[in-house]
UniProtKB/Swiss-Prot annotation:
GO cellular component, one term: cytoplasm
Keywords: Ribonucleoprotein, Ribosomal protein
Lineage, highest ranks first: Bacteria, Bacillati, Bacillota, Bacilli, Bacillales
A GO biological-process term: translation
S-S pairs: none
NCBIfam families documented for this protein: PRK00504.1 (NF001764), PRK00595.1 (NF001860), rpmG_bact (TIGR01023)
Disordered as annotated region, ranges: 21-49
Protein name per its UniProtKB record: Large ribosomal subunit protein bL33A
Organism, scientific name: Staphylococcus epidermidis (strain ATCC 35984 / DSM 28319 / BCRC 17069 / CCUG 31568 / BM 3577 / RP62A)
Pfam families tied to this protein: Ribosomal_L33
């Protein structure tokens, strides 16, 4: 079962990306390094509720 998740920047808090994940394979929160346009650099983005 795939669900949509919102990814927020850990440095500025902006919610920049929407992605999907499989809850059965990844029950924990997703973390990805993505580009943050506010910080103008690649930062860690974490799944939000």
């Amino acid at each position: 079962m795939r669900v949509n998740v919102t990814l927020a920047c850990t440095e500025c808090g902006d919610r920049n990306y929407i992605s999907t994940k499989n809850k059965r394979n990844n029950p924990e929160r997703v973390e990805m390094k993505k580009y943050c346009s506010r910080d103008n650099k690649h930062t860690l983005h974490r799944e939000t509720k």
